Structure formats: structure tokens, C-alpha cells
């Protein structure tokens, strides 16, 4: 049908006859001549139709509506100088049409304009419902092309590094990995269910047992969890696993991979080594294991100074094994009012939503500290001097304080820190926006305490190899459970986790001991992970790997706010596909075939 696409045309095509196909982006009548901007996936080409070209042809062109699908045949001409459009690649050319065929008319008025000339901010619900039109608008189409470039760069790099791409099953066994599984009824085994994989974790480990050595996969994964701007119920991850490697080798290799992606997609050279920070250091200084290091306001520990001044909230926090921490907002006295910090204020609400009861504050005015009487009346000169020294606060600065359990204090001050950074436009200056602050977080704890259930849970997952616990002394794991760290690592970029991985446990007895530690009985271990334990008993090599969130990498490279802008057909924040109305009811006959009966609580 076509022998050229729009943006292939250049001055060497002048005088040549070509066929083009695409959509009518817009039609204009000027002095009896019809000008049509023809749009295809590559770009635009102006086509012209004169009355003297034929009555039938001219009448066809007169009735064309935007988004009509057409094919045109004509001669490429140079545009008159006064009509050159420097905003498009073909802006010096036009096509004088000899023949026009309408391939498809639009039936009704479109739900929103598609042409870039009529582009408007359209509600996301409408964009998701008519996603094919949204793609046709161009911006989303370019996002998908960038995603393709990222995947291509990944495949080229890993293929050249000796990796083998292997597909792992999508219908698998339900195993506890943190989030809820999506379950699929098994018709041939009534009463049993498959689960869609939350990750290919166990299968890629089994591939290492099988001697594959280096594996990767662009893997679809599924998690039935509450959604955020950077979460989807089905998502794509780059999954990598390697045999006979150290933690250092995995980190170094994947750092080179990330640098390769940034160079090939953005033409950005990331020459410096990515810095590293222990999990404990991140929690102490930022209150989170995925810190945004583009700006300051680090958390400072004031427990030793304020824990014994007689202020009840502070005293109780320390007595209960908690913390008193602060962040310092430079020139905060002039930019943040008391109303915003007190109950009902926006900053107070941010802390409250993160679990805090509230915030205390100290305003630095010269050598004096201004705060509530219950705090100020108990501060002596040494207290004031030490507070200023630790917080690095100066005249005009505002100190915000949180007190309570260490987890809540970290969590709330982290959220407040992020909120204030946006509120004060700390990331709006060009330097901050252009920064790619990659950071490896290492030395994660093996376990964390589930306070509600009073039991330990694996912080990453229960297949991470513990540090400094020899196979022969595996009982040390139980004895030192609260201080055990793992060969686990995350890569963080500008406050978002790009990926995470670990060295895996490759000895069966050690794996069983870890699973017992997270509360599984030997019977449950055999029932849920017996196939893995058996494989580890058959000569499993030392191995480890990492998984990167491909949707999130694409989101950051594109500079968009939601991973929905990187996916062709995403779900909304209620995990629904507005295009197909999935999920939806199924027929009674389908349910009967599966021996499933649905009851809905009133």
C-alpha cells in the first residue's frame, strides 16, 4: 500500500512519486487549495489538493474529517519558502496529491482530540477507556518506543555477556512471598489452584541448579496489592541470575548494565561509581531504605539530649526503646508557619498519615530557641548548644522533631522530608532535576519483627543468604536473629527503588533453618518448598541475582509521574481495565465447570 513513511522523506525525494498512508491530523482550506497534515507513526507530511487536480479528488478532500484513515499517491515537491515549517522534519516538503483513497471513516465524534494541534489535558479515566486513541496522539507512542529501546539495550548487553533468556511458567504454585497471589482455578484438578507468579524467583534458582550459569528474562509478574502511582497488579521486571558469583561481582556487573542503558537510551555517560550505603545508615540518616540523596534535611538523633529533659512525650519514647529525631529546614522560619505544623496543618497531616501522633518544632532565632514552654523551660545552655551542633541549625532555621517508636519516627520524618522538599521546590532547580543519584543500599537485616503477629519476617525474602553464618554453624542464625544481616542489596535512584537482589541460600539445611525462623513448620516447608529443598540437595551451586522494575526504569528515564504512562494497556488504581471492563463476571456454566460457587457478604 505505502512505499514510504512520512519522516523518511527528504529533499532527495523531490520529484518522485510516493504512496503514503495515515490519518488526517487536520485539514485547512486556503484560497481554494486544501492542505492536509497527514500523520503516521513516524511524523507528519503536508499534502496539497487543488481544484484543477480533478473534481472528484477535490470533493473527496473537502469532506475529510480529522482521524479519517487515508492513502495518498502523489509527487514530492519543495514547499514555497513562506510556508516552510521548521518544527517538523518534513517541513520543507509537501506532497501534491494525484490520487486519494479513504481506507476508513470515523463513525462518531471522538471522545477527545487526537491531533497535537488540538491537544488538551484529558482525564485519565477517559484516556484509559480509549487507550488506542491515547496511543495515537503521539506522546504515549513515543513512550512505548522508548520502552522498546530500553529492552533492546538490555537484551543486547546481556546477550553479549553470555546470558541465556529463558521463559519461566506463568501458572505455578502459590507460595508465601509477601503480597497476595492472583489465583487461577485448575479445571482438571478441581479444588486446586495455580497462582500467577509474583516473581520467577524459585524457577531462576532451579535454572542455576540445572547448570544454566547466566539467566535473564523480561518477566511478567503479578501481585494482588493496593496500587500507587508506581504500582500495577501486573508488571514487568528484568530478572537476572548468575552462578558462582560474589555479591561484589553481581553489583559491579549490574552497575555496568544500568550505565549501558542510560548511554544507549539517553546518551548520558554515568562515569562515576555508584555510591553505597548500608541499610542501617540509610535508616539512621533518612528514615527509609530508598533515600533521595539530591537534597539535605538528614535525620538527626536527639535522644541523648532530649530524652531526659522532663518532657513526658520525649521521656516515654526513650523509655520504650524508641527514638527522638529531627530534620532541619534551612530558613524554615520564614517559609513554614506554625499553623502548618500544628494539628490540622498540612505538614502535621503528612506526619499523622505516616503514623505519628504529631510533630514538635524548634525555631532558631539568633542564639535562642523558640518552642513550646514544656520543652523550652527544661533546656539549659548545654542542651541548646548540643541541639544546634547536632542539627547544624542556624539563625532562621526550623527544626522539626518526631518522638516515639523508631519505625514510626523514621517513617513520618521521611514522609515530611519528601513533602517539604517538594513544597519548597528543592528539586525544581536545573541542577537537581538533571541529577541521576544512583545509590546501592547494602547489608539489609535478614529479618524484621512483625509487631502485630509477634514473629520475624524476611525483610527481602527467605531465600537470601545470611552473612557471617557458616553452613556448619547454621544454628547461629537462630541465636543471632535480630542482628543477622543478609547478602542483599537494592539499587535506588532519586528516592525510588529500581531493583533488588541477593546471594541465595544454596544449602538445603540452611534454607530450612531460615524458613523455620519465619514461622514455617517442617511440614509446611515440605508442602510449600519441598521441590526447592530437594533441588538444593542435588548439587546447587552458589548463586545470586537481581530483579529490576522495567516499568519504573522507563518511568524515570521518561521523566513521567506514573508507570501507567509507560505501559500500553495499564489498569487504573482500582486494578480495573477501563478499556475491556476487566475484571468482569463469568457465566454460571463456567463456574460450574470449575466447581466454584460464589457467595457475597452483605
Curated annotation (Swiss-Prot):
Q: Which Gene3D superfamilies match?
A: Bira Bifunctional Protein, Domain 2, GAD-like domain, Nucleic acid-binding proteins
Places the protein is found: Cytoplasm
Q: Name one GO biological process term.
A: aspartyl-tRNA aminoacylation
Which EC numbers characterise this protein's activity in its record? 6.1.1.23
Q: Which GO terms describe its molecular function?
A: aspartate-tRNA ligase activity; aspartate-tRNA(Asn) ligase activity; ATP binding; nucleic acid binding
UniProt site positions, description: Important for tRNA non-discrimination = 30
Could you confirm whether the keyword Cell inner membrane appears in this record? Answer: no
Q: Which reaction is the catalytic activity of this chain?
A: tRNA(Asx) + L-aspartate + ATP = L-aspartyl-tRNA(Asx) + AMP + diphosphate
Q: What is its main location?
A: cytoplasm
Give UniProt keywords alphabetically: Aminoacyl-tRNA synthetase, ATP-binding, Cytoplasm, Ligase, Nucleotide-binding, Protein biosynthesis
Which cellular component terms (GO) are annotated to the entry? cytoplasm
Signal peptide coordinates: none
Q: How does it assemble?
A: Homodimer.
HAMAP family referenced in this protein's UniProt entry, alphabetically: Asp_tRNA_synth_type1
What is the protein name given in its UniProt record? Aspartate--tRNA(Asp/Asn) ligase
Q: What is the lineage of its organism?
A: Bacteria, Bacillati, Cyanobacteriota, Cyanophyceae, Synechococcales
Amino acid at each position: 500500500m505505502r512505499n514510504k513513511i512520512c519522516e523518511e522523506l527528504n529533499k532527495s525525494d523531490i520529484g518522485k512519486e510516493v504512496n503514503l498512508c495515515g490519518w488526517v491530523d487536520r485539514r485547512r482550506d486556503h484560497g481554494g487549495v486544501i492542505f492536509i497534515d497527514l500523520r503516521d507513526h513516524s511524523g507528519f507530511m503536508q499534502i496539497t489538493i487543488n481544484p484543477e487536480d480533478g473534481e472528484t479528488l477535490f470533493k473527496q478532500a473537502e469532506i475529510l474529517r480529522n482521524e479519517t484513515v487515508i492513502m495518498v499517491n502523489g509527487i514530492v515537491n519543495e514547499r514555497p519558502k513562506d510556508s516552510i515549517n521548521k518544527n517538523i522534519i518534513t517541513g520543507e516538503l509537501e506532497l501534491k496529491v494525484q490520487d486519494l483513497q479513504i481506507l476508513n471513516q470515523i463513525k462518531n465524534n471522538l471522545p477527545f482530540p487526537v491531533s497535537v494541534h488540538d491537544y488538551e489535558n484529558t482525564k485519565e479515566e477517559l484516556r484509559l477507556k480509549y487507550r488506542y486513541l491515547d496511543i495515537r496522539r503521539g506522546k504515549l507512542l513515543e513512550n512505548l518506543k522508548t520502552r522498546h529501546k530500553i529492552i533492546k539495550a538490555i537484551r543486547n548487553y546481556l546477550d553479549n555477556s553470555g546470558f541465556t533468556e529463558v521463559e519461566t511458567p506463568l501458572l505455578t504454585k502459590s507460595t508465601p512471598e509477601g503480597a497476595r497471589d492472583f489465583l487461577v482455578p485448575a479445571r482438571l484438578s478441581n479444588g486446586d489452584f495455580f497462582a500467577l507468579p509474583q516473581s520467577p524467583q524459585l524457577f531462576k534458582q532451579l535454572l542455576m541448579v540445572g547448570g544454566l550459569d547466566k539467566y535473564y528474562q523480561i518477566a511478567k509478574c503479578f501481585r494482588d496489592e493496593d496500587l500507587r502511582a508506581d504500582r500495577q497488579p501486573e508488571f514487568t521486571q528484568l530478572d537476572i541470575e548468575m552462578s558462582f558469583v560474589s555479591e561484589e561481582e553481581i553489583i559491579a556487573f549490574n552497575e555496568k548494565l544500568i550505565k549501558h542503558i542510560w548511554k544507549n537510551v539517553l546518551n548520558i555517560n554515568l562515569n562515576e561509581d555508584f555510591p553505597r550505603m548500608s541499610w542501617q545508615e540509610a535508616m539512621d540518616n533518612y528514615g527509609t531504605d530508598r533515600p533521595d540523596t539530591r537534597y539535605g534535611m538528614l535525620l538527626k538523633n536527639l535522644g541523648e539530649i532530649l530524652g531526659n529533659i522532663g518532657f513526658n512525650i520525649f521521656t516515654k519514647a526513650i523509655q520504650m526503646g524508641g527514638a527522638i529525631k529531627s530534620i532541619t529546614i534551612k530558613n524554615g522560619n520564614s517559609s513554614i508557619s506554625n499553623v502548618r505544623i500544628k494539628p490540622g496543618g498540612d505538614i502535621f497531616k503528612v506526619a499523622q498519615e505516616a503514623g505519628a501522633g504529631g510533630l514538635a518544632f524548634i525555631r532558631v532565632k539568633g542564639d535562642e530557641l523558640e518552642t513550646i514552654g514544656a520543652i523550652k523551660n527544661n533546656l539549659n545552655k548545654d542542651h541548646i548548644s548540643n541541639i544546634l551542633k547536632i542539627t547544624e541549625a542556624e539563625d532562621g532555621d526550623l527544626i522539626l522533631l518526631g518522638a516515639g517508636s523508631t519505625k514510626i519516627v523514621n517513617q513520618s520524618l521521611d514522609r515530611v522530608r519528601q513533602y517539604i522538599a517538594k513544597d519548597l521546590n528543592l528539586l525544581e532547580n536545573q541542577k537537581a532535576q538533571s541529577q541521576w543519584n544512583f545509590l546501592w543500599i547494602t547489608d539489609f537485616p535478614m529479618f524484621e519483627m512483625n509487631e502485630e503477629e509477634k514473629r520475624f519476617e524476611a525483610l527481602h525474602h527467605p531465600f537470601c543468604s545470611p552473612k557471617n553464618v557458616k553452613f556448619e554453624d547454621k544454628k547461629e542464625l537462630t541465636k543471632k536473629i535480630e542482628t543477622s544481616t543478609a547478602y542483599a542489596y537494592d539499587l535506588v535512584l532519586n528516592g525510588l527503588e529500581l531493583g533488588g537482589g541477593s546471594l541465595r541460600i544454596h544449602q538445603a539445611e540452611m534454607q530450612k533453618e531460615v524458613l523455620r525462623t519465619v514461622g514455617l513448620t517442617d511440614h509446611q516447608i515440605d508442602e510449600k518448598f519441598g521441590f526447592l529443598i530437594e533441588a538444593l540437595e542435588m548439587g546447587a551451586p552458589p548463586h545470586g541475582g537481581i530483579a529490576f522494575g522495567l516499568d519504573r526504569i522507563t518511568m524515570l528515564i521518561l521523566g513521567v509521574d506514573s508507570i501507567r504512562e509507560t505501559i500500553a494497556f495499564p489498569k487504573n488504581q482500582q486494578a480495573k481495565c477501563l478499556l475491556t471492563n476487566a475484571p468482569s463476571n463469568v457465566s454460571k456454566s463456567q463456574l460450574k465447570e470449575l466447581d466454584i460457587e460464589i457467595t457475597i457478604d452483605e
